[in-house]
Swiss-Prot record:
It catalyses: Fe(2+)(in) = Fe(2+)(out). Belongs to the CCC1 family. This is VIT-like transporter 1a. GO terms for biological process: intracellular manganese ion homeostasis; nodulation. The chain crosses the membrane at residues 61-81, 89-109, 153-173, 180-200. It comes from Glycine max. Vacuolar iron transporter that is required for the accumulation of Fe(2+) ions in the fixation zone of the root nodules. Plays an important role in maintenance of symbiotic nitrogen fixation activity, for example during symbiosis with Bradyrhizobium japonicum. PANTHER family: FE(2+)/MN(2+) TRANSPORTER PCL1. It comes from the Eukaryota.
Length: 206
């Protein structure tokens, strides 16, 4: 909170203070113009750790693209053998369940291994001297370590979302040729959307 001396009320229009008001303090508050009006300039103190976000964002984008491409390819492969919408949908749903489970397990093992390697390296660097446990906890809080559970949930959920695109695209189309065209078109469009979402969430430079 800023307290302004009452003597400042006698300041001249150009912002200077008369000599007889020696004790007055002139504070300059930066302003910015918005639509021709002067407004106070404020700083955005909201800080987001994008390195931490990148841990689950990588798993999410990978899972979404994998679910989209793998399930769409599986459905088109089954459709080439049997041009039946029901067979394609059953194959796609089976691919969704199996793929989501596989991505979740694989992501958890991979990220947890990375977590253990980084923690082990931190212990070796600190030599675990006297007070090393406390220093290790402080260092772990300071550094951005991977979160296995977060990456697992992001990967499985986004794989399912990606797999739903070809499934929903083919669910209501009877003609085989039209069904394949719609699945391919929607899959290509979804790839662009997933890439755009990843760029926006990651705040990548334009």
């Amino acid at each position: 909170m800023v307290v302004v001396s009452p003597k400042m009320a006698n300041a001249t229009p150009n912002g200077s203070v008369p000599h007889n008001h020696v004790g007055a303090v002139l504070l300059t508050i930066p302003t910015i113009k918005i639509d021709g009006k002067q407004t106070l300039a404020t700083e955005d103190h909201t800080s987001i750790d994008y390195l931490q976000r990148a841990q689950w964002l990588r798993a999410a984008i990978l899972g979404a693209n994998d679910g989209l491409v793998s399930v769409a390819s599986l459905m088109m492969g089954v459709g080439a053998v049997k041009r039946d919408a029901k067979a394609m949908l059953l194959a796609g749903f089976a691919g969704l369940v199996a793929g989501a489970c596989g991505m979740a397990i694989g992501e958890f093992v991979a990220v947890y291994t990375q977590y253990e390697v980084e923690v082990g390296q931190m212990k070796r660097d600190m030599n675990m001297s006297v007070g090393g446990e406390r220093d290790l906890e402080m260092e772990m809080e300071r550094r951005t370590l991977p979160n296995p559970l977060q990456a697992t949930l992001a990967s499985a959920l986004c794989f399912s979302i990606g797999a739903l695109v070809p499934l929903l695209s083919a669910a209501f189309i009877e003609n085989y040729r039209t069904r394949i065209i719609v699945v391919v078109a929607m899959s290509c469009l979804a790839l662009v959307v997933f890439g755009w979402v990843g760029a926006k969430l990651g705040k990548t430079p334009k």
